[in-house]
């Protein structure tokens, strides 16, 4: 049985910080490194056959460069998804392991050089 996913997302800076330290990846959309969140809610639909991947990178603040960690995770998530999308269909668990390793590597590489 095929199904359709309806999704909606937004990102808000909150009341404490001067910059938003959260990010996401949704159907190719994410925020820039330095951002103030979003001013509105975005929404859409996708078919099951599109093998969707939606990700939230929350709670990466509190340390220096939390916004960079969230951005790098979103960027690596999107890059891996675009190059290895068929992995979701073939072996979802392995795909998630690989994408987590890719995101972690991007953040660790940044930490070593900055």
What residue ranges belong to the model's regions?
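PP2C/PPM-type serine/threonine phosphatase catalytic domain
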Residues: 1-114
